[in-house]
Amino acid sequence: MEIRRGGELNSRRLGAALGMRGVILGVALVLLGVSGCGRTPAPKMLSSSFVKPFTFDVSLGPNRYHIDGYFVRSPGSGRLPAVLILNAGQGDAARCVKTHGNLALTLGMQVACISIPGYGHSSGPSRLVGPQAVAAAHKALNLLKARPDIDPKRIAVWGIGDGAVAAGLLMDQDPRVGNIILQSGAYDLVRLWPEAPLVAKLEMLHQVWPSRRVLRERSVIENLPPRLKCRVLIIHGARDHRAPLSQAERLAGALRMRGARVSTTYFPRADHDLGANAIKAASKFLSAALAEPGHGLAS
């Protein structure tokens, strides 16, 4: 299957290159704490040199995908912990970094945001979080692990929305992932399909024909290994109509049965988009999980 034509790819890359400086400057201004009149600036500051593109290509069979992302370097020295954020449906990777990049300051860790295939400025199609999303997450982890400024044993993965599905499938397949945050995801597509509202079904049909085989391949619960030695934080809104709370509760139970250390944070009045509430819960989890060497991503 032809994913992208050469002319389209070159045009998009040219546009991305022309706008790269502006995007990095915009992200840097947010991280600098630049504010309006009468507001107190942030006590700590990052220059634009701390924000760099984190883009790469990943191949799956005959298809090749270009992955868009950004990396925010913490001002700390040495090999630091890191968090990889798998973004999907919450804007592009630049917006992800604007929202979460400040963790480089507040937690003293490296922050990488990528858009999984089919989202943001990453090439697609997504095909309902197909195998290409997991392949992109695998490669991103390997790239981070190879960096001299990252402790390869202290890397966490944080998936948001459909990115949580990709993160969960990565957890199913890669025993190196020791700490994972799953936010607002749908983890049992086999059960979700008959319960999903018409709008959600139409969105799924637009991406892929939802046969039982396809739904099982993309269901985190259906692909869980017999045992898991990882820490998992599940964050979810009780009023989420795109991914019902029962999806998160069912996954939490399945993970505990397999030996995972699971904690949950459910917001009774929240829907699919959790905003600052999710960042606060995730920050607490990351601080504890990556505080000491030897936790996060096994070598």
Question: Language-model segments: which ranges?
Answer:
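Short beta-strand/loop motif that positions the catalytic acidic residue
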Residues: 228, 234-236, 240
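The serine-hydrolase catalytic nucleophile loop
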Residues: 91-102, 116, 246
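Primarily recognizes the serine-hydrolase "nucleophile elbow" in alpha/beta-hydrolase
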Residues: 143-149, 153-196
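Conserved alpha/beta-hydrolase
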Residues: 106-123
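C-terminal catalytic histidine-bearing segment of alpha/beta-hydrolase fold enzymes
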Residues: 249, 253-299
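Mobile cap/lid helix-loop segments that gate and shape the active-site cleft of serine hydrolases
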Residues: 185-223
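Alpha/beta-hydrolase active-site loop
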Residues: 128-148
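N-terminal cap/lid segment of alpha/beta-hydrolase-fold proteins
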Residues: 41-76
